[in-house]
Curated annotation (Swiss-Prot):
Organism, as annotated: Pseudomonas paraeruginosa (strain DSM 24068 / PA7) (Pseudomonas aeruginosa (strain PA7))
Cellular location(s): Cytoplasm
Protein name: Probable RNA methyltransferase PSPA7_3453
Protein EC: 2.1.1.-
Positions with a binding annotation for [4Fe-4S] cluster: 108, 112, 115
Keywords: 4Fe-4S, Cytoplasm, Disulfide bond, Iron, Iron-sulfur, Metal-binding, Methyltransferase, S-adenosyl-L-methionine, Transferase
Length: 346
């Protein structure tokens, strides 16, 4: 079911656009579809035919996704394993301070060598209402004021569904446009489509290396944009929407944590409308990769920050409960072994 299908379903019951908007907003807030307001009861607003049909509609919406299991973490986050109607599972993560990370695909085709999700390949796309349903399930547990499309999958490979979900959340869902974050490895179609959207989300770009060849090996199926081209396209969008690009950099010890790489970041991002997010790798048992030592991470942040690039450390939420993308699902269903890329540091 997509957004237009839901509106048509309600229209078939006799709902006018005003009725549809109220019902959809109630669902997006995790409330009953016929939830009343302080001033108006449902029976005084919704036609009888609509009220009689809502239980069936509610049943259909509940069937889109259900919570399979919840895994609270010590940092205040909570990882949700969500089961879709065909019994495929995706992950959502409730973040501290009102954030939620949602999945856009079951699996992923990009095949980032340090990502658990990519090991299974792409199994199927997640529909727009399946993404929104992840928000609904989360809102039944706590307030959600920000949604980041950074979970399982590459949003650019499911662009129509992701943009539809963003539009719905940024309108009837009541989430500010800056608080909807589209994360991508850098598909040219993203830079073509986002500027023309009614809801223009913030953009997070997966950089991970300033060396084009190393980035190609780390992200083997990403579009063939050079780091320079990626940053240039990001800067253009940032100036159009007037909020900075978030650049993502998963820190891998001995792979992309050298000063040469940090100098590459300075070369690309100094003077840009950008924030660099350094993300220490979240390892699992038997991993081929490790995160740098804590002292090293602090050194890198200071090195970049003191030279003019706003830099933050973004630890994966829920590190004590399989916090990395796809890890919870992988433990539940098994995963393929990890490939390892070695880099000689100068």
């Amino acid at each position: 079911m997509r957004s237009q299908d839901l509106h048509q379903r309600l229209a078939d019951l006799g709902a006018k656009p005003l009725h549809c908007g109220r019902i959809v907003r109630a669902w997006l807030q995790g409330r009953a579809l016929d939830a009343c307001t302080a001033r108006q009861r449902a029976e005084d607003f919704l036609p009888l035919s609509v009220r009689q049909g809502l239980p069936r509609v509610a049943e259909e919406l509940e069937g889109i996704a259900r919570l399979h299991s919840e895994h609270p973490a010590s940092d205040g986050s909570s990882r949700l394993l969500v089961e879709l109607a065909d019994r495929q599972r995706v992950e959502s993560v409730l973040l501290p301070r009102g954030g939620l990370c949602v999945s856009t695909q079951v699996g992923c085709a990009v095949g980032c060598v340090f990502c658990m999700t990519g090991r299974s390949g792409l199994l199927r796309q997640v529909g727009s209402l399946e993404m929104v349903a992840q928000v609904v399930l989360a809102r039944r547990r706590r307030a959600v004021k920000k949604v980041v499309f950074m979970g399982m999958g590459e949003p650019a490979h499911n662009l129509d569904n992701v943009l539809e979900a963003i539009d719905l959340l940024g309108t009837d869902g009541g989430i500010g446009h800056k608080n909807l974050v589209f994360s991508t490895v850098g598909d040219p179609r993203v830079f073509e489509r986002l500027p023309g959207q009614r809801v223009k989300p913030a953009l997070a770009l997966s950089l991970h290396s300033t060396d084009a060849e190393l980035r190609r090996r780390l992200l083997p199926k990403a579009p063939p944009l050079s780091p320079e081209e990626l940053v240039e396209a990001g800067e253009t969008y940032a100036r159009q929407v007037d909020y900075p690009i978030q650049y993502q950099w998963t820190l891998l010890e001995g792979v992309n944590d050298s000063l040469e790489e940090m100098d590459g970041i300075l070369r690309l991002l100094k003077g840009r409308f950008a924030v660099m997010n350094l993300i220490p790798y979240n390892s699992m048992d038997g991993d081929a990769y490790r995160r740098p030592r804590g002292e090293r991470i602090v050194e890198l942040v200071r090195y970049l920050h003191s030279r003019g690039v706003l830099t933050k450390v973004r630890n994966s939420a829920g590190q004590d409960i399989d916090g990395g993308c796809g890890q919870l699902r992988a433990r539940a269903e098994g995963a393929a072994p990890q490939r390892h890329i070695r880099v000689r540091r100068g």
